[in-house]
Structure formats: structure tokens, C-alpha cells
């Protein structure tokens, strides 16, 4: 998610520098992916807390624990929430056929190049077997939150605030 936000944020910042008065940016951008697929959003707090808790267990040495979200997040949920945080509209996930009908724009080609590694996650259905981690964390109070618009806004908002602060 953070790579997607950073790539999009960089494009939006260039636009906003040229047109500083713009609020909501309309950016017609087709991104290769499927709304029906999922991404595995995992808050860093959950990962750190889970790592610390599992590392304290004597029986965890040498084991593999996937600190993943047991309920993957549909692309149709996270994309509009991230766009809202970035104050942008017009971004949509499309299949490869969309680019056969109308070739990529320069911006789409640049964005695709920046996101090349991550496209596999936008198109595929990544599944992580997190049963060992869930078993190890049972009755500890450490649980990965279900991704809602509110949680995604918090995660994405934090990162956008960080990027904005760096460019000051």
C-alpha cells in the first residue's frame, strides 16, 4: 500500500506545485488490477506487537510465523479510501484489455513502471497461511484489526502526513 501511495503522491505533488489552488485533483489514471482481488493490509503495530510476543515464547525458536491479516482487504475497499486521503479522483483498476482499447498515457506508463513489482499483488489473490501466528497470539489480546475505511484512512493518512512533512 505504501508504495502505491508514494507513487501516486509524487505525481499529485508535481501537479499541485503547478496549480497550488487545486483541492480535489481529477486524475484519469488506469491502474492494472482487479477490484475483486484482495491485498493483505497489516498494520505495523500488529506486526511489531506480534513479533515481540512470539519471540518471548520458548517454543517459537526456528519457527515461521506469517503475521498477515486473516481477512484480506478487497481492492474495491482500499482504493477509494486512499484516493480520499490523497484528495484525488479518477483512479480506477482495470484489466489488460483496457490498454488494448486505448493505449497508455505517459502518466499511466510512468506509474506502471514505478509500480511494476507491486502489480502482482493488485492482480493476484495473495494468500498467507497465518494459522501458526494466530495460534501463538491466541489469548494475548494481540489481533490484526479488520480493515475498514476508518482503519485504512488512519494508516494512509499517517503516511501522507509523513510525506507532506518531509517536503514541508
Residue ranges and their predicted role:
Residues 50-117, 159-166:
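Mid/C-terminal beta-alpha module of Rossmann-like enzyme folds, strongest
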Residues 129-168:
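Amphipathic terminal alpha-helices
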Residues 46, 77, 132:
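Ca2+-coordinating acidic residues in Ca2+-binding motifs
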Residues 44-56, 149, 153:
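Amphipathic alpha-helical segments that line or abut small-molecule/effector binding pockets
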Residues 11-31, 97-143:
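A hydrophobic C-terminal alpha-helical subdomain
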